[in-house]
Amino acid sequence: MPDFVSDSIFKDAFLRASRHYIEALDLPAFDSRRSSDAKEAIDSAACINNRMLQSFAADLNEQQKSDVLNSTLLAQLAADKAYPKDEHGRYDVKGWYNKFSEVLLNLGWVSQNTAFWQYKIHGKSFTADKAILEIINGLLQNNALLLAQATINALKNLPENDSKLTLFKFNTCSDQMGNISLGVCTQKNGLIEYDFAALYLETKKNFKQILFIDFSTSDFKLFAGTNTITLNPDVYSIVRDQVAQKLHDRVGSYLAGLDI
């Protein structure tokens, strides 16, 4: 791969384009009622990041984890603003995901493999935690798959009144729709690779939690997505400070570390 980062022409062009793009992004209003320790999330091997459950291989350092957390949070918030929920908590899932992907692309992430489909469940009921683990099983192997499973278990083992579980429920459920993502970040050849699966649930009945409860297969529509994206940390370093400035105090409202 050519060393684009050392090319001053590339750096200047990328900086100008990304600066304009980031400045123009609309984000939801800041909600100071929700607060968590962002530093705890960076120090943890797994975390809640808005509607995403993310875990990190042991060889990723704090800066790399921070880059993943900040960039994917900014992309989620921009998509939330572009595709808001209606009075039933529903929104344009494909539009949301396209906006999310667009933002990541403009921050230096490159998509390697993406898929989106209507997910079929065999049987009369299912739980979303088992479904998303089944989906991500096709992306991950060995230790990475164990990380994903441990992240789900860490969330499941939280007390019902734990503020982290409350944060996750608030971010992933809205009356008749739920949206979660589970992924693992690893380091390969100097790049950060993020493999993740997403699950989107639409139902005619209101619900307050998407994981660890039984849903009847007759009451919902279920969609799934997978993606593998990579980030060159040197490229991201060009926009790192601006992303942090754009997020400002929002980070503490959406991140929470998990013990695995």
Task: Give the residues covered by each predicted segment.
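Short, flexible coil/linker elements and helix-boundary hinge sites characteristic
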Residues: 26, 108, 142-143
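Membrane-inserting effector segments that mediate pore formation, membrane fusion
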Residues: 117-169
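C-terminal assembly and membrane-engagement modules of membrane-active proteins
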Residues: 1-84, 89-90, 97-98, 158-260
